[in-house]
Design a protein with these regions (language model features):
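Elongated, amphipathic alpha-helical interaction scaffolds
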Residues: 1-213
Length: 213
């Protein structure tokens, strides 16, 4: 029996963020900007053309800022470390053909790290995670720091954010309908819950294939 894709929340989030219009819309809400041209946004990829979104991450550059977004359905204190790896991997491509040993300063995009949380465990509306929290030896003045902002996007949390950001709001409507039919309607098979006839279910063949895999 096919029990459906247990990672459906991450997979749908990734597909949404692969769309430049969606990614730009979310960026505008989080940063208070009004960019309207999706072509101003550049999706960042790993070597061999493998998009970071395939790994449940979204990474893109807008106006010299590199945003790295990740969805989490469980609490993960290692996000700063993971984002450090993502950021350095992407930056290595930016500077590949530049002389970092020369006298001229090589400019790199401003990093922005965001985690969208929608798990079952109760969490604050917003909070921060720092790379220095993972250091084996605590220091008051870390010489390397990375800060992730976490948004709890479950309904009942961050209402103002969800009202402004229709992409995230509609995504959470879909997730909540799957939860509803999976639990309350006693649909033990996750695939049936995902494909149940709810108003906000995903309809495209590509997304259905992802949900079922």
């Amino acid at each position: 029996m096919n029990n459906g894709n247990r990672e459906y929340k991450s997979d749908v989030f990734s597909m949404l963020m692969e769309d430049k219009v969606n990614a730009l819309s979310v960026y505008n809400v989080l940063n208070g900007t009004n960019y309207t041209n999706p072509n101003d946004l550049e999706i960042c990829t790993l070597d061999k053309g493998v998009s970071l979104t395939i790994r449940n991450d979204a990474a893109f550059v807008v106006d010299a800022s590199l945003s790295i977004y990740e969805h989490q359905s469980t609490v993960c204190p290692n996000m700063p470390v993971r984002n450090l790896v993502y950021y350095t991997t992407i930056i290595s491509k930016f500077i590949k053909n530049k002389n970092i040993y020369g006298r001229s300063l090589v400019k790199i995009p401003v990093p922005k790290f965001v985690v969208f949380y929608n798990g079952d465990e109760d969490q604050p509306e917003e909070y921060y995670m720092k790379l220095s929290d993972a250091f084996e030896k605590k220091t008051d003045k870390p010489e390397l720091e990375l800060v992730c902002k976490v948004y709890n996007i479950n309904f009942g949390k961050n209402k103002q954010l969800l009202d402004k950001c229709t992409v995230i709001k509609h995504y959470m409507i879909f997730v909540d309908y799957v939860r509803l039919y999976h639990k309350e309607q006693e649909l033990e098979d996750l695939e049936r819950a995902i494909n149940y006839n709810v108003p906000y279910k995903v309809d495209t063949t590509r997304e259905r294939d992802c949900l079922k895999c």
